[in-house]
Amino acid sequence: MGLDRRDPNPESRSTRLVLEQLAVMSSASTPVRIGLSGALGRMGHAIAGALDGRDEAKLVLALDRPGTEGRPFGALKLGVAADIARCDVAIDFSTAEASARLADIATERGAPALVIGSTGWTDAEDAQLRAAAAHVAIVRSGNFSLGVNVLAGLVEAAARRLAAADWDIEVFEAHHRRKVDAPSGTALMLGEAAARGRGAALADVEVRARDGITGPRPEGAIGFSVLRGGGIVGEHEVVFAAEEEVLTLKHSARDRGLFARGAVAAALWVAGRPPGLYDMMDVLGFRS
């Protein structure tokens, strides 16, 4: 029997292809200078690894929480947020509060463009980021995976075609025990996609908690169910349940490297873009 030469991780291969296409499209004669905020976290290390050895992008600045300045990070020492103006793009996976502050600093200095993967945004922090997007280009996404963004498109299409009177929508998500916000940014992104498909605002139809005697499920509700435990990288399911059949759309993440590669692809894409708030649907060309 011959060897099976199929890629065991086709999504990883697809993400690499997208990143390579973006690199070819780049007309820059010098590497895109990348700053990394949240460098000491799991995603920070994964992104640094994804940048290592790339010709079209170079890590020139690494940041983390106050008090870490001067600590070694690979060939660099951790710097301060005020230095981000010397970067072309800053990739930030920290907290929503820190991301909003970083956006303010970028606005004050007129640079750099931002790629933000932080989740758990308050309304005030979201407004702060949107105001900054009037001055700098920002890509924000609850998930930088190619597969999840395809899933969001499928969820929106299904919600548009499956009537709320007959089909209930529930978003399930599971993550490792160290994740501090719930529902996940990805779950909310999928909920937003479902709500768009039904022509509704998620805030008007979401149900995030159930306890005790809750009564019948409201028609058109989009529910969220959350699990935290162990080292789960990320599991997301969107269930469309009718009386006689159930449709389940699911994505499983096996390695943080796929998110890191997606973030690098977003950084290459957003470098030199006009101010505005973008997401991975823009980066991947899914939105005309």
What are these regions (language model features)?
Residues 4-9:
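Intrinsic-disorder-associated, low-complexity terminal segments enriched in Asp/Asn/His/Tyr and depleted
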Residues 90-91, 115:
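N-terminal Rossmann-like NAD(P) cofactor-binding module of classical short-chain dehydrogenase/reductase
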Residues 94-95, 119, 228:
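Short glycine-/small-residue-rich Rossmann-like dinucleotide-binding loops
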Residues 33-84, 166-288:
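C-terminal substrate-binding/catalytic lobe of Rossmann-fold NAD(P)-dependent oxidoreductases
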Residues 11-13:
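Arg/Gly-rich low-complexity intrinsically disordered repeat tracts
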Residues 118-138:
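Rossmann-fold NAD(P)-binding glycine/threonine-rich loop
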Residues 65, 119-121, 143-144, 174-176:
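Short, ordered loop/turn segments at secondary-structure junctions
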